[in-house]
């Protein structure tokens, strides 16, 4: 099982490498190409199926500046042919001033022909820590 966790984590790192390089060919390699997959980019509605997801990555890559992407705090769970990875994304435009954007992400991979392929990606902004500490979210 440790070997499968390592392979799933490698697939996750390949996804973030493709994202950082804004390389659509590498991104295509990371994903399953079925109709049963989904992606939710920060601030977007859910996209279903490879056609929609592929179009979204092409638009994002065409309309964005070069950036650095770091994936931190990876936690992986593997069960059968599914792997779930939780992580923190830090995205920073090259040459930009200020703090990088911080996203919390959940990535789900399915084993297809001995390779881990992404079937779900969901990223959303991290909550403001100071504001969330002031709120009483548990009653």
Indicate residue ranges for each PLM-predicted region.
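A beta-strand edge to alpha-helix "cap/lid" segment located at domain peripheries
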Residues: 2-29, 36-139
């Amino acid at each position: 099982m440790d070997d499968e966790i390592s392979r799933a984590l490698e697939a996750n790192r390949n996804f973030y490498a493709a994202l950082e390089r804004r390389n659509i060919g590498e991104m295509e390699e990371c994903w399953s190409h079925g109709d049963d997959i989904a992606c939710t980019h920060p601030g977007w509605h859910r996209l279903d199926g490879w056609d929609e997801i592929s179009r979204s990555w092409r638009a994002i890559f065409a309309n964005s500046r070069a950036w650095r992407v770091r994936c931190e705090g990876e936690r992986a769970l593997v069960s059968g042919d599914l792997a779930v990875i939780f992580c923190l994304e830090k995205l920073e435009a090259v040459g930009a001033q200020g703090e990088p954007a911080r996203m919390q992400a959940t990535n789900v991979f399915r084993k297809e022909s001995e390779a881990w392929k992404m079937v779900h990606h969901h990223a959303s902004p991290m909550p403001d820590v100071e504001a969330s500490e002031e709120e009483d979210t548990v009653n």
